[in-house]
Amino acid sequence: MIASVIASVTASLAPALRAEQARIKWLVAPSSASWLEQAKARPDLVLIDHAHCERKAAGVALQLMFRYPSDAGLGAALSPLAREELEHFELVLQLLQRRGNALRPLPAPGYGAQLTAAVRKGEPVRMLDSFLVAGLIEARSHERMALLAAHSPDPELRELYGELLASEARHFGLYWLLCEERFGREVTMARLQELAAVETQALTGFLKHPEDVRMHSVGVELGSSPVGQLHADPCRIVR
């Protein structure tokens, strides 16, 4: 139900822009094979972190709604997104419980903090950057869930991540449309390229302790181009 609401809201935004069906490259570099192997080796740890990611994503959407209460249409766009993120949180939480694991605090990687630090102060650029950072995080989550859906040795986890892919694509698609509708394509694209470089830098390096693997821990292939769904079209409604 909520997924259809998000698709409906997204479809109502900037129809002329959607008609162009431009392919937007969100991610500069793909995740590394080492990250995938680390995540496969500690599936329940990544699952716990995934639950925290869904909870935080809901909080980001709500925070943006409260920050810009006078922005017409923003609440209608982000409210169903926040609800869907919480549905995903509950889904992951239930799976953790079935597997005998409890949600617990985990030290967060520096990924989110580095992206947040790149958000400029003052409006309206703060709004643009906040939307794009949220979209970049969703895009990276989508890319890594796709890897786990394809390569996890656990059928239960392959099914979970596969089911969530369409939602993640809708989410970063929605953030793109919110930016483009308010700031235009040229401004949005230029800033996306800058923040995408920050996103790659935040994931550059090698994990010193395997137990620190997270959904957004370090591990990208520099000089390689993301493939397939990584060149996602955020203007396309994914159902």
Language model feature labels by segment:
Residues 2-239:
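Non-heme di-metal
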